[in-house]
């Protein structure tokens, strides 16, 4: 991932020193080096509040809470992104597996992977996303 930092496909500029200051070590390793947080440890794995999940690096809105579901995999799972333009997909052949990596389309941050074992009554997709790659913005409660 770090070799993609200057990839012209990603318009959001990233300065490594600034990212290291702003992100936690886990957020940095996940988003910049495609690390994976341990299952069932992420802040948003069990979050059920209404709101929007944003890229922790650039703030792009990525997923709505209405697309989140409990897959039992240990990471937050969504059946679709907020729209088709916010996600970049790339084949990933690491760790002896063939998977589809999911990145933020604005900054290239590694988010997780997408699999074809999601809810069949929705999209059939499971966007398996590291909590460390996300910030959650709760919707204000109505009074």
Swiss-Prot record:
Identification of the protein by name: Peptide methionine sulfoxide reductase MsrB
A Gene Ontology BP annotation from the UniProt entry: response to oxidative stress
Known cofactor(s): Zn(2+)
Pfam families: SelR (PF01641)
Organism: Burkholderia pseudomallei (strain 1710b)
EC number: 1.8.4.12
Segments forming domain MsrB: 16-139
InterPro entries reported for this sequence: Met_Sox_Rdtase_MsrB (IPR028427), Met_Sox_Rdtase_MsrB_dom (IPR002579), Mss4-like_sf (IPR011057)
Keywords, ordered alphabetically: Metal-binding, Oxidoreductase, Zinc
NCBIfam families with a match to the protein in the record: peptide-methionine (R)-S-oxide reductase MsrB (TIGR00357)
Extent of the signal sequence: none
Keyword tRNA processing: no
Reaction it catalyzes: L-methionyl-[protein] + [thioredoxin]-disulfide + H2O = L-methionyl-(R)-S-oxide-[protein] + [thioredoxin]-dithiol
UniProt record similarity statement: Belongs to the MsrB Met sulfoxide reductase family.
Origin: domain of life: Bacteria
Active-site residue list: 128 (nucleophile)
